[in-house]
Regions:
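ATP/nucleoside-binding phosphotransfer catalytic cores, i.e., glycine-rich phosphate-binding loops
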Residues: 59, 63-65, 90, 100-171
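A generic local structural motif
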Residues: 43, 57-59, 83-85, 121-124
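Glycine-rich phosphate/pyrophosphate-binding beta-alpha loops
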Residues: 17, 21, 72-86, 150
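A generic structural signal for short beta-strands and their flanking turns/coil linkers
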Residues: 51-53, 67-69, 92-97, 131-133
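N-terminal hydrophobic or amphipathic segments with adjacent small-residue motifs
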Residues: 11-13, 43, 55, 74-76, ...
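Catalytic core of DAGKc-family lipid kinases
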Residues: 1-69, 73
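Gly/Ser/Thr-rich active-site loops/lids in small-molecule metabolic enzymes
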Residues: 33-38, 87-107
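Short acidic/glycine-rich loop or secondary-structure boundary segments that cap or lie
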Residues: 21-24, 65-67, 79-82, 106-109
Length: 171
């Protein structure tokens, strides 16, 4: 994925996250000593400190403005340890899978979180799941996580670079 910032260009292979997704990644880094449980711990901690943000995104040609908790764009099924965030993702299909969570109360969010491990969260009406070729996050100055690194800030414009890399693996 090609990521256009206001004054630079970056690239991502797998994941771009905003909102709660970026906050969870920052917190998980502080709890590396928890091993595989650090992402689950960070997610529960973030749920307890729940705060939605104004989410302004463009997906293909549609503009969505709402209070949201997170936005993630993924090329593969998994994020964190065993979380099936994008259960229909394929690395080589030329699309990025977008998962958006609109504002929810803590109890509903806990329910959705437990469904992420099976991929069933995409059936919740507060979760929007799409496969797209490009998107933008139009908020200003919000932190991002890019391929597991806490890096960059919004706004960004992202486009899929289909077949830009040659992988030597069966997909």
């Amino acid at each position: 994925m090609k990521i256009m910032h206001q004054d630079s260009v970056d690239f991502a292979v797998n994941i771009i996250g905003w909102g709660m997704a970026a906050k969870i990644n920052v917190l998980a880094e502080r709890f590396r000593w928890l091993g595989n449980w650090r992402y689950s711990f960070a997610a529960v901690n973030s749920i307890l400190r729940l705060r939605s943000q104004q989410m302004n995104v463009r997906i293909d040609d549609e503009i969505i403005e709402c209070n949201g908790l997170f936005f993630m764009a993924l090329n593969t099924i998994h994020t964190g340890k065993g979380m099936r965030m994008a259960p229909h993702a394929k690395l080589n299909d030329g699309l990025v899978d977008v998962v958006m969570l609109r504002q929810a109360n803590r109890l509903r969010l806990l329910k959705i979180f437990t469904q992420i491990f099976s991929g069933d969260h995409v059936n919740d009406p507060l979760v929007e799941y799409r496969q797209v070729r490009n998107f933008s996050i139009q908020t200003k100055g919000d932190a991002l996580t890019i391929d597991g690194e806490n890096y960059g800030k919004t706004p960004i414009d992202v486009s899929v670079l289909h077949k830009a890399l040659k992988l030597f693996a069966d997909l």
